[in-house]
Regions:
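Surface-exposed, polar/charged faces of alpha-helical domains
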Residues: 114, 121-124
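Amphipathic alpha-helical segments in structured regions that serve as interaction surfaces
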Residues: 91, 107-108, 125, 129
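Globin-like tetrapyrrole-binding proteins
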Residues: 133
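Amphipathic alpha-helical segments that form the core helices of the histone-fold
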Residues: 106-117
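An acidic, gly/pro-interrupted, aromatic-rich
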Residues: 1-99, 137-147
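Short amphipathic alpha-helical interaction patches enriched in hydrophobic/aromatic residues
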Residues: 95, 116-119
């Protein structure tokens, strides 16, 4: 995430952009589908505060988006050098700024083990399982909504 202030607006379609949505170019007459899906406020009027909402389309986006999938693969590659339990812990710290509880840790380890086994327990199957798990974490409301 680029935390610098100011500068030109960026296109939402620019996959290399790491700016906050405050810096997105917004066409008032035709709101981008991703912004509309995330219940973006009406662009033609002032909106000092947004109410948190979650829509079914948001969940489908996180499950089917090539962009989200690529971010999950990048995170998987970043965590690949550590043991499975530590991967789950680090994923929670990076995505949610907290440690997983015991149930979340066990669920993450169980999910990745079962997914890898279903894929033939090969190295590629294990890597795919971790990418799937991380993508699922990115679809949680806790990741999507800033508290």
């Amino acid at each position: 995430l680029d935390l610098s202030m100011g500068g030109p607006g960026q296109s939402i379609d620019d996959l290399k952009s790491y700016r906050r949505s405050l810096y997105l170019v917004v066409a008032r007459e035709e709101l981008h589908p991703v912004l509309r899906m995330h219940d973006f406020p009406e662009a033609s009027s002032h909106s000092p505060r947004r109410e948190p909402t979650t829509t079914p389309l948001q969940q489908l986006y996180f499950l089917n988006s090539a962009w989200i999938e690529s971010r999950a693969v990048q995170l998987r590659d970043r965590l690949e050098s550590v043991a499975a339990e530590q991967r789950v812990r680090q994923a929670y710290v990076l995505l949610f700024a907290r440690e997983p509880d015991a149930e979340e840790l066990a669920a993450g380890l169980e999910f990745t083990a079962k997914q890898a086994a279903a894929g033939g327990a090969t190295s590629d199957a294990e890597r795919a399982a971790w990418a799937d798990y991380l993508q699922a974490l990115m679809g949680l409301s806790e990741f999507v909504t800033l508290e």
